[in-house]
Amino acid sequence: MRLVVVQNGDTLSSIAKKMGVDVEEIAVQNALPSEKVVAGQTLVVPGGRSYVWMPGDTFSGVAERYGLTVETLRSSNKGIANPQPGDILELPSQQKGGVVVAGFLELTTPDQDAKNVKKFAPVSTSIGLFSQGMTSNGQIVPANDASALQAFEQTRSVPAAVFSNWIGEQFSADALRVMLQSDTEQQKYLNTLLDILDRKAYKAVIIDFEMIPGSLHTSFLIFIEQLSGYLQQRNIPLLICMMPITLNDNPNASGLASYDYSALQAYADYLIVMAYNWHWGTGRPGPIAPFMNVASSIEYALSQVPRQQLLLGLIRYAYDWLVPFQTGEVAGVIGVQDAVQIAIRENIPIQFDRRSLTPWFAYQDKKGRIHELWFEDARSLQLKLQLVEYFSLAGIAPWQYEQRFPQFVPMLQDNFQSVNWL
């Protein structure tokens, strides 16, 4: 796939003519409802392969990584003498490596859940069904997962049970504390978890406990050790969601201390680095997954954990903030495609922030309110996929498949093949 950023004056027809493809091919790959496009929009176009220049890149370094000569790389990109981070270059097609693709799917309705499983199973090693939630007293709220589980039949993908401390509106540290600090409640939780595994078709377990206080470090580790023992007896892999820690962070800080990479990796098959939400929907607007933060969180994880155990969390969503930000307000969460459609509808050019290497734009709604949206697009996604390859990580963990991001699957297939656990 080639990446093309729409310029002022471009039309879908002019882009198709320049790239030597049919308009329909571009429209299908990008799920365009019409031929309308907007400046700054990144499109995927069939044929060839693109590379997005990363901070620290040199022609010699990129050429060496991809088995090219500097002359070949330069001749393929004659119009780019001095690339800057975020610039798009062309590469010859390469042999694709295999990675784990541990996607997440937030359950909505039985019919839609089944459709999503069937749609994404062909490109996913596993799909984690979100979620087996939690009551306020720390016990499991079973998921309405029957339709989704049935849809896995005759697919190559593995259904993963996601156990979280989501209590319906937020992740609850208090609910988690009730369970982890009581031997009785913890064993009750584990018994329920194992009963779900024994009764249903799940073949993997994901622990997504978020906002864990540092005071629960030891209790959480004991819980994971016990769970790991039970799962090993059943030959079921364990994945643990981890808050991102950069090289500049204090890993012993209250909000990070319980995410002990070095200790937890001894009991997990994979750790998922949730390398996003540096700007939360409950905070001020800004880039959700800035490139340098993502890279630094990978480097920290690699200082604690073997690379073959690390999965990079990726996002498929946008935050839509009202500005100026007011404490207590919460940004809307929409899919990438929905964000792009707003830009097209409002005819607002999409900006690409060269510092965070992510897209954003602002617009005024019918009520006169100013919105600021930050999100991922095909260009910023390609940068994250290149990091997976650069650091030789085990794979990726996209959040989440219900959100619309039509370029995601073509980009994934262009870079990697998903490995099979079956």
Give, region by region, the residue ranges found by the protein language model.
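Primarily a LysM-type cell-wall glycan-binding module
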Residues: 1-19, 41-67
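Glycan-recognition patch characteristic of GH18 chitinases/ENGases
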Residues: 93-188
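Short, acidic/polar
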Residues: 107-122, 183-198, 253-262, 376-389
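Conserved, mostly hydrophobic/aromatic
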Residues: 127, 207, 271, 312, ...
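Active-site groove signature of glycoside hydrolases
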Residues: 128, 190-219, 270-284
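Substrate-binding surface in catalytic domains of secreted glycosidases
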Residues: 136-140, 217-221, 226-343
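Glycan-binding loop/region signatures in secreted carbohydrate-active enzymes
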Residues: 162-176, 316-384, 414-422
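Acidic/aromatic/glycine-rich contiguous surface patches that form carbohydrate-binding/processing clefts
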Residues: 384-422
